[in-house]
């Protein structure tokens, strides 16, 4: 079973003002977490300004980590909401240069101070374009997919047509939901990476924000993760507010 772990880069304005020294301290905290995770996780995935809250870019954070340990496998999320096509070309070159494993291209959440949502780049169009231009030979390009799929609608079909290396699910609620996704996607020769949020009181607010109901696996998260790992190509664990729990579970899964 391939288990990856998701980390959020530090916030740029954690207290509504910028402090360079605080930012450096928070970067050091991420470094410490990565050092621990390397013992138990196949790779690290850095998010890109989750919930529209400005953070150090995933690519910058990956480069910082790579500078002190280039052997660590890292993947990154990239939001298209904040970028035009020119900046996407600039962005895709950097992870290739830094030897990053893959990119998850996604629209991203709307920032609180967003002035508009016109002419947004669709992630599927970006992946389709970059794949047609042979970027896929240098880096894996992934797309996100809902945690529940009953059939292949137009939105899912467009993502399939983009031919990503893998689909990364939104946080999975049940094994049956994951089985449905895999049954629908596997015929297209696209891998499925199951994202799972660890159930914890400290993570409850994060779960509520994305409408996640972890009732099915709350009491037996390790068994649930193992079952998901048996049918998905990879598992991506996330525990945004409870890192100690994450390390405990990763040790048991090792």
Model-derived regions, located:
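Active-site-adjacent beta->alpha loops and helix N-cap segments on the catalytic face
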Residues: 52-65, 83-90, 109-132, 150-152, ...
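Flavin-dependent oxidoreductase catalytic cores
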Residues: 51-75, 212-216
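Active-site-proximal loop/turn and secondary-structure-junction residues that shape catalytic pockets
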Residues: 7-11, 48-52, 80-82, 107-111, ...
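Hydrophobic faces of well-ordered beta-strands that scaffold small-molecule active sites
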Residues: 3-9, 42-46, 74-78, 103-105, ...
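Catalytic-face loop-and-helix region of soluble metabolic enzyme cores
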Residues: 189-234
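Catalytic domains of carbohydrate-active enzymes, especially glycoside hydrolases
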Residues: 28-47, 159-168, 230
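C-terminal extensions of enzymes
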Residues: 1-3, 225-253
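Active-site mouth loops of central-metabolism enzymes
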Residues: 1-28, 74-86, 139-152, 208-219
